[in-house]
């Protein structure tokens, strides 16, 4: 069996508010909203293309959550989104409350990237790939 990523799970003090931010920022769809047996509010989201599930929940009963960390760090450090225009998307996300942390950065022979702080101290990356030149090479 080939492994594939099943979902990403974010923890948030206000799961609905966080889910609605991702709806506005990246066209996620909210496909479920419930209080689980664990006592946490649990919001199920899907990416616009339906390829990635993102779950957003609060603390479970008797669970104390530490702070988020949008700085570079060990462990799961960020998740990335494709961008057709970094500057346009950075400005749009900043209007939604995100904060630019790094970039835009041009990787030699690679994409342009930028890192932003999203709600709940989640680090997200925007990736703008080089555009193909029409008519072929040279």
Task: List the model feature ranges, each with a label.
Residues 39-41, 61-67, 102, 133-136:
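A short, acidic/glycine-rich surface segment
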Residues 4, 39, 75, 110:
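Exposed loop/turn and edge beta-strand positions of beta-sandwich/beta-sheet ligand-binding modules
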Residues 49-53, 60-62, 86:
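Short, charged/polar surface micro-motifs in flexible loops or helix N-caps
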Residues 81, 90-138:
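Vicinal oxygen chelate
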Residues 1-19, 76-81, 127-138:
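N-terminal beta-strand motif that seeds the catalytic metal site of vicinal oxygen chelate
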Residues 21, 87-92:
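Short amphipathic alpha-helices within nucleic acid-binding modules
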Residues 2, 9-54, 95:
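Core segments of cupin and vicinal oxygen chelate
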Residues 53-56, 126:
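A short acidic-to-branched-hydrophobic micro-motif
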